[in-house]
Amino acid sequence: MAAEIRIGTSGWQYKHWSGRFYPEKTPTGRMLQAYLDRGFDTVELNNTFYRLPLATALDRWRDATSDQFIFAVKGSRFLTHMKKLKDPEPGLARFMPLIERLGPKLGPILFQLPPRWGPDLDRLDGFLEALPNSHRYAFELRDASWHTPEVCERLRKHNIAFCAYEIAGRKSPIEITADFAYVRLHGPTDRAYEGSYTTAQLRQWARRIKDWRGSLEAVYVYFDNDDSGYAPRNALKLKELLA
């Protein structure tokens, strides 16, 4: 069975996309519909990293999208950057029931660990054990010292994806540690969130995704180079290359 392929952007509500990707003068309240109108079937909720959204907002986004739509959700920075994975149960008890309001549209949950914080395997073990086993999870390990066989072994044990990423001229390894792959593309230049991927660069990713199709259950790719509306245009081009 071929893998389910989901390609989208990290967020949809960017005022600077109005006139660049969305129709001119698109109000923020209409941007989700404008995003959907371009044929996207997934998005990564990035604002959940900074603050917990209102339940009413999650309900509204859930109800505005089709039954086939998938929301990937970025985990709260309280868990990853403030607590640094320590004592995760109280934070998860607040976070998980809230995002579960998305129902069957809830896709992978991404936890991004901070740069300049090296491995703490005991904390990682405790955090992984605390995660409910009813969801898919991915870890974006921004500090390269986490890119080790010991960390990958732990992710593999729990069927958690090692998030492949490109940011500010740095590229993570490509490691498959779960029955799905998760990719975040923050831009091809030395400045994060800027620049547009070339067709040649996107073809490289398309070839890799095609290779994964036969061995994985799903592949999720999210573009975060929101500057000048590059992210959604790059996402649509990658979808075209995979068609």
Model features per residue range: what roles?
Residues 1-243:
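Residues lining hydrophobic/aromatic ligand-binding pockets adjacent to catalytic sites
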